[in-house]
């Protein structure tokens, strides 16, 4: 019995990890669109403010991948900043299109889930 419970817990954690990956990417793109440009630590704070606790080791590789995929552009800025230069990310045209498609798909999935719950 304990083995089944542990297996279910592992399956649940795996499912949550997979869901969060796609959802986190959607949230990051949405935040960047709303802000215009954002640097990594600011992004972490904004995610935390809406109860999405994410580690730096998760966000920075994701930002780098989305930058490499052409969804984001990155620029180093030092003007008007106290301290070290910061790498700011902004949405590209491809990123904006991708966000629109992802948002629509996400809304359809949530709608279908809600409909299933009402049956």
List each model region and its residues.
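Accessory beta->alpha helical hairpin/"wing" motif in late/C-terminal subdomains of nucleic-acid enzymes
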Residues: 91-95
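Basic amphipathic alpha-helical segments that dock to polyanions
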Residues: 59-61, 65-66
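N-terminal helix-turn-helix DNA-binding core of bacterial DNA-binding proteins
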Residues: 16-58
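Amphipathic alpha-helical dimerization/coiled-coil segments
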Residues: 96-119
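Short secondary-structure boundary/capping segments
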Residues: 20, 64, 80-81
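Short beta-strand/turn micro-motifs at beta-sheet edges
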Residues: 14-18, 76-78
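Short, intrinsically disordered or compositionally biased N-terminal tails of bacterial proteins
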Residues: 1-15
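Beta-hairpin "wing" of winged helix-turn-helix
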Residues: 69-83, 90
């Amino acid at each position: 019995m304990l083995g089944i419970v542990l297996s279910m817990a592992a399956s649940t954690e795996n499912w949550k990890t997979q869901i969060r990956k796609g959802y986190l990417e959607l949230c990051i793109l949405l935040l960047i669109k709303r802000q215009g440009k954002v640097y990594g630590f600011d992004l972490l704070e904004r995610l935390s403010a809406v109860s999405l606790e994410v580690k730096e080791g998760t966000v920075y590789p994701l930002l780098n991948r989305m930058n490499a995929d052409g969804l984001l552009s990155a620029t180093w800025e030092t003007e008007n900043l106290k301290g070290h230069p910061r790498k700011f990310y902004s949405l590209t045209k491809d990123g904006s299109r991708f966000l629109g498609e992802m948002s629509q798909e996400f809304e359809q999935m949530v709608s279908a889930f809600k409909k299933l719950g009402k049956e």
